[in-house]
Amino acid sequence: MRALSILGSTGSIGLSTLDVVRQHPDRFKIVGLAEGHDVNMLAEQIREFNPSIVSVRDAGSAELLKTLLGTDLPEICHGIEGAGTVAAAEGSDMVVSAIVGAAGLTPTVKAIKAGKDIALANKETLVVAGQLVSDLVKKHNVRLLPVDSEHSAIFQSLQGHRQEDVERIILTASGGPFRNSSFADMEKAGPEQALKHPQWSMGAKITIDSASMMNKGLEVIEAHWLFNMPAEKIGVVVHPQSIIHSMVEYIDGCVIAQLGSPDMRAPIAYALSWPERCESGIKKLDLATIGTLTFEEPDMVRFPALRLAFDALKAGRTYPAVLNAANEVAVAAFLNNKIGFTAIAETVDKTMQAHEAYTPVELEEYINADGWARRAANAIIG
């Protein structure tokens, strides 16, 4: 029986994780839940899964939750501190890190320091503070298991092989809703068009990141830290069908890939059950029905966010944290109709150019870089 705490339980990844848990009551139990936006849904989850500790966004949400639940309450915390308390709570042996954005960093660090294995869906944790997190994982002897479909695919394709035999890893990208759009059309696109992902059902922020290809850029940085790969050995290919989730090319010219239906429950189930496997509930793959798998080079002129992410990875220091924070601010501004779609990457670019990078050591230094970038990006947006 694996005891789990889920950070971001009411989001897309959290809901998919609970669906996997629901299928295997003999294998998984829920110890803690943390959410930020939907207290009513959290109340339903508490009734079903009976966690011993939960966290909500703020004190007002905590009072609302108490009212909704009545008697027989779990321990209730709130804020980022509360999420960290859930992450480090006794009784769990794995934490699913699925809070959106850099807000997931501090609770994930607390979970690692508490000796919890991490099922990582929050890619920003490694984008913002990859060196710090990697060092902590080694120091506390915990496992960091990828939940992103691409990184799960790489992880699976590396099993049983030597690191020195790897030529490169290849992340696949759907291309998003604007794969065939001109730059001029993207300049005019609003949130409604950008939120129409052709393959995946995800939250708003990651869907916009997929449309700009910033999501793939963040995944490149995440892959660097997860698999100890330099930028030169990380490739990206556009694969519109989203059936091949990523690949590993070896020095003998052979390529090993992981295929499956585009459903996040599969990589979640693999992370939760590793080194075993368990039923995920996804639709079985029928290649004859799919018929054709196609591939294209990514266009970094129309999608400069991907180039900016590679630039940030190569430059290192605080640039990845600044890239991520500026992007979070710009995506929020786009979703609120304050800027156009192509202004997202422009805002990130200008913020990175204005940044005087340094080499962070402590968590606070990473957080300071994040805060600086948010202020700078907001000033650029106006």
Curated annotation (Swiss-Prot):
Q: What is this protein called?
A: 1-deoxy-D-xylulose 5-phosphate reductoisomerase
Q: Provide the binding site for 1-deoxy-D-xylulose 5-phosphate.
A: 123, 149-150, 174, 197, 210, 215-216, 219
Homology family: Belongs to the DXR family.
Task: Name the enzyme's class.
Answer: oxidoreductase
Needed cofactors? Mg(2+); Mn(2+)
Give a GO biological-process term.
isopentenyl diphosphate biosynthetic process, methylerythritol 4-phosphate pathway involved in terpenoid biosynthetic process
Carries keyword Ribonucleoprotein?
no
Molecular function via GO: 1-deoxy-D-xylulose-5-phosphate reductoisomerase activity; manganese ion binding; NADPH binding
Organism per entry:
Chlorobium luteolum (strain DSM 273 / BCRC 81028 / 2530) (Pelodictyon luteolum)
Binding positions (Mn(2+)): 148, 150, 219
Q: Which UniProt keywords apply?
A: Isoprene biosynthesis, Manganese, Metal-binding, NADP, Oxidoreductase
- Give the EC number(s) listed in the UniProt record: 1.1.1.267
The record lists the catalysed reaction(s) as: 2-C-methyl-D-erythritol 4-phosphate + NADP(+) = 1-deoxy-D-xylulose 5-phosphate + NADPH + H(+)
**Function text:** Catalyzes the NADPH-dependent rearrangement and reduction of 1-deoxy-D-xylulose-5-phosphate (DXP) to 2-C-methyl-D-erythritol 4-phosphate (MEP).
Annotated residues for binding of NADPH: 10-13, 36, 122, 124, 203
- Metabolic or biological pathway: Isoprenoid biosynthesis; isopentenyl diphosphate biosynthesis via DXP pathway; isopentenyl diphosphate from 1-deoxy-D-xylulose 5-phosphate: step 1/6
Q: Name one Pfam family in it.
A: DXP_redisom_C
